[in-house]
């Protein structure tokens, strides 16, 4: 007996006859726009902060967060879901540092995030807690380790991939095309900032300002991240074409 479309919609671990998991697809639809660009010097993350009301305080919306001093993450999607994942990643990195007296590798951190992302669905025979649906958030994880700067993308399906430059969320198809045309491994960190914001500017519905965009960098020289304040962000925006 075949299931109806609505039953496939509700089933978080039931594939449709076309091989689709609708709950994962719905989670992907919740993702907004974010861009990451990696070069030899470090990684740049730029994320749109969509303000739904003029009464909203822009500083209360945080789209780039710290996982560890050498790891940052741009989140796109449901913030409550992202908080659960980020808290998990922070615990994993601190446990690794406590046990091995060294910072956790970027890929290892991403792997732990994606392991958590896969824990959804019915929980009949396991003692572990699970989400009843996929996490509605995608992440761009940037970090520095012994391999140098790296940029990873993870989506609600629990898949992760390493990129030199990546756009996620609404309008990401056009943004990714721009990145493919203009990206070069020889870019400096300043040029990566400009490329990320220029690409963001092209696909955003509103004019880019210091209140609707968040910019962060993590550099190999400093081995730590920096989130730009309004004055620093305004200086970079002024250089855009």
Curated annotation (Swiss-Prot):
InterPro entries, sorted: Ntn_hydrolases_N (IPR029055), Proteasome_alpha (IPR050115), Proteasome_alpha-type (IPR023332), Proteasome_alpha_type_5 (IPR033812), Proteasome_asu_N (IPR000426), Proteasome_sua/b (IPR001353)
Keywords: Cytoplasm, Nucleus, Proteasome
One GO term describing the cellular component: nucleus
Nucleus keyword on record: yes
GO BP: any one term: proteasomal protein catabolic process
Coiled coil: none
Domain of life: Eukaryota
Subcellular location(s) of the protein: Cytoplasm; Nucleus
Main location: cytoplasm
Family annotation (SMART domains): Proteasome_A_N
Pfam family membership, one: Proteasome_A_N
Family, as annotated: Belongs to the peptidase T1A family.
Primary role: The proteasome is a multicatalytic proteinase complex which is characterized by its ability to cleave peptides with Arg, Phe, Tyr, Leu, and Glu adjacent to the leaving group at neutral or slightly basic pH. The proteasome has an ATP-dependent proteolytic activity.
Assembly notes: The 26S proteasome consists of a 20S proteasome core and two 19S regulatory subunits. The 20S proteasome core is composed of 28 subunits that are arranged in four stacked rings, resulting in a barrel-shaped structure. The two end rings are each formed by seven alpha subunits, and the two central rings are each formed by seven beta subunits. The catalytic chamber with the active sites is on the inside of the barrel.
Protein's UniProt name: Proteasome subunit alpha type-5
Species of the source: Dictyostelium discoideum (Social amoeba)
